[in-house]
Amino acid sequence: SEEVLKLEECISQLQQNSKDAVFMAYYNEMTYENISKAVGFPVNTVKTWVRRSKDFLNRCVRGLH
């Protein structure tokens, strides 16, 4: 659908670290702590990546970026 294509386009604009964190959090259902261990960055950094990515994706999908 058009919405899926738009979301894929928006996801492609994320930095790789953020993209990885979002996929681990939502598709793999990993905790922030486990993502932190997997990527080697502090938990708060991972939380920031996910939060900013969610905000960006919401704006992007609605055409507000």
Predicted stretch roles:
Residues 4-6, 33, 37-40, 54-65:
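C-terminal edge and immediately downstream basic/flexible tail or linker adjoining helix-turn-helix-like DNA-binding
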Residues 28-29:
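Flexible coil/turn residues that form the inter-helical turn or adjacent wing/linker of helix-turn-helix
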Residues 49-52:
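Residues within the DNA-recognition helix of helix-turn-helix
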Residues 21-25:
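A short pre-motif secondary-structure segment
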Residues 17-18:
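The N-cap/first-turn positions of alpha helices
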Residues 1-12:
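Acidic, proline/glycine-rich intrinsically disordered inter-domain spacer in sigma factors
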